[in-house]
Structure formats: structure tokens, C-alpha cells
């Protein structure tokens, strides 16, 4: 199980990303539309002044049962070893046992 502080940090990043999503999109759109280099730099400075954790690249998917950040399957929201355990226990409909 992941530490609670890591999970809370990830939730904080998700909130910040949602808060600044529209602002970042509009600034990125402005950068692509403006032709003057000085204007692009000014808009880029505004973009850089937003918090680091507001970028979507800093988000990690986590297993909703264990909080593990590695080997996550998007379709299930589970990490690999939890997915395997649940499959063997017949808790996931439509999944078949495999030798992996």
C-alpha cells in the first residue's frame, strides 16, 4: 500500500491540474496564434508562472485499491498484481486465467 502522503499529494496535483486546465489551454492556444516573438515570450512567462503541479504530465495513475503507481491498467484502474489476484478469484467478469 502506498503511503497516505503520496496519495494525498497526487490528489492535490489532480485538483491543481483541473483548476488551471482551461487557463493553460488558452495560453497555449495564444502562443500558437501569435506571430511576434516578443509576444510569445510574454505569454510563455505567464504560462511558466503557473504552479508546477498544474501540468498534466506530473500526474500518475494509481491503483485505487493499493495506491501503487506502477503497472496500472487503464481499463480497470488496478495494478498488475491486484488485477491478477482478482482474476484468479473470479472477481472480474470476462477475464480468463493466463500463465503470466
Curated annotation (Swiss-Prot):
Task: List the coiled-coil residues.
Answer: none
Q: Which UniProt keywords apply?
A: Chloroplast, Plastid, Ribonucleoprotein, Ribosomal protein, RNA-binding, rRNA-binding
For this UniProt entry, the molecular function terms from Gene Ontology, in alphabetical order, are: rRNA binding; structural constituent of ribosome
One BP term from GO:
translation
Output the SUPFAM superfamilies linked to this UniProt entry: Glucocorticoid receptor-like (DNA-binding domain)
One GO CC annotation, please?
A: chloroplast
Q: Which Gene3D superfamilies match?
A: 1.10.287.1480
Name the InterPro entries for this protein: Ribosomal_uS14, Ribosomal_uS14_bac/plastid, Ribosomal_uS14_CS
Query: Do you know which Pfam families this protein is assigned to?
Result: Ribosomal_S14
Q: Which HAMAP family match?
A: Ribosomal_uS14_1 (MF_00537)
Outline what the protein does.
Answer: Binds 16S rRNA, required for the assembly of 30S particles.
Quaternary data: Part of the 30S ribosomal subunit.
What the record says about family reads: Belongs to the universal ribosomal protein uS14 family.
Which named protein is this?
Small ribosomal subunit protein uS14c
Q: What is the species of this protein? A: Cycas taitungensis
Amino acid at each position: 500500500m502506498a503511503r497516505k502522503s503520496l496519495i494525498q499529494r497526487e490528489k492535490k496535483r489532480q485538483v491543481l491540474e483541473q483548476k488551471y486546465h482551461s487557463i493553460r489551454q488558452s495560453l497555449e492556444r495564444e502562443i500558437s496564434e501569435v506571430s511576434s516573438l516578443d509576444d510569445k515570450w510574454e505569454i510563455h512567462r505567464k504560462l511558466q508562472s503557473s504552479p508546477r503541479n498544474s501540468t498534466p504530465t506530473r500526474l500518475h495513475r494509481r491503483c485505487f485499491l493499493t495506491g501503487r503507481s506502477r503497472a496500472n491498467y487503464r481499463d480497470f484502474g488496478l495494478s498488475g498484481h491486484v488485477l491478477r489476484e482478482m482474476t484468479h478469484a473470479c472477481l472480474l467478469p470476462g477475464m480468463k486465467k493466463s500463465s503470466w
